[in-house]
């Protein structure tokens, strides 16, 4: 499958401003997971994060639009595959208090899945980081991030429409080269985001070739709740695949130009989908 070229977005601002915005965005997302062993275990894979997202979206669509309430059967029907894994994941969400089960008053066999405050607050913070970066890159006017926090109707409208983001992630799977390579691995998306953050911190201005930065595999593994051997293996394979260039003598790496282009293409597409949903939510309320 051919890689996706970057959208014609966010290219009018300076290189330095773009570097700063992306570094701050990556840092904010990484900080949400840094040292949070339980969160990383629960949401370590894309399927798990998306299943939780689908659950919350369906709950808000029921609350706002009168759509069908989320149940395990509904999530499994929409997932199409991996239904046993999905059932185990929902059980973990219930066990950790992120989701509660509510019996249907007319049919006690039916259990509705109700996202709890911890899960909703985490989603709100996660969306806010994306809208902040959209504003910094010029994809959205200022004020959307603040409105997400302060305006309940806007948050509800955004979440109701956020399923389109998940749909696009699925339809674009495998289209972003090196980013897709990382994202398919356990914790790989967060590892790639941390590498992107450190790249832009080391390269606030354009350099050719780009400057290398320290490779702290043990610290990275500990912070993201991954095994040292898993992270070492992932980074070794990434170097062999041409996503990273390694200076073993100085224990440093740099992103290859191809990997940087592919990852920035993914990020700009991803953020543009958030911007579209934000525009639609604003029009709705």
Model regions and ranges:
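An acidic intrinsically disordered interaction segment
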Residues: 7-25, 147-164
């Amino acid at each position: 499958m051919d890689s996706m070229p970057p959208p014609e977005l966010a290219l009018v601002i300076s290189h330095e401003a773009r570097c700063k915005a992306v570094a701050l965005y990556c840092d904010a997302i990484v900080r949400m997971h840094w040292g949070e062993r339980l969160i990383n275990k629960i949401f370590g894979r894309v399927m798990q994060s998306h299943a939780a997202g689908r659950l919350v979206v369906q709950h808000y669509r029921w609350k706002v639009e009168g759509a069908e309430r989320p149940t395990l059967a509904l999530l499994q029907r929409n997932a199409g595959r991996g239904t046993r894994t999905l059932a185990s994941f929902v059980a973990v969400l219930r066990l950790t208090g992120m989701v509660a089960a509510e019996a249907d008053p007319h049919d006690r066999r039916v259990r509705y899945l109700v996202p709890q405050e911890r899960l909703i607050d985490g989603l709100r913070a996660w969306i806010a980081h994306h809208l902040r970066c959209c504003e910094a890159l010029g994809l959205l006017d200022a004020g959307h991030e603040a409105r997400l926090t302060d305006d309940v109707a806007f948050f509800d409208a955004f979440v109701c429409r956020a399923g389109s983001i998940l749909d696009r992630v699925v339809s674009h799977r495998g289209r972003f080269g090196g980013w897709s390579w990382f994202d398919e691995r356990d914790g790989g998306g967060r590892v790639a985001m941390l590498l992107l953050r450190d790249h832009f911190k080391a390269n606030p201005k354009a350099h050719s070739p780009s400057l290398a930065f320290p490779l702290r595999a043990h610290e990275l593994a500990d912070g993201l709740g991954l095994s040292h051997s898993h992270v070492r293996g992932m980074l070794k394979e990434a170097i062999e695949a041409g996503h990273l260039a390694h200076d073993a003598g100085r224990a440093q790496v740099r992103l290859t130009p191809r990997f940087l282009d592919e990852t920035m293409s993914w990020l700009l597409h991803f953020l543009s989908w958030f911007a579209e949903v934000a525009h639609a939510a604003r029009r709705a309320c």
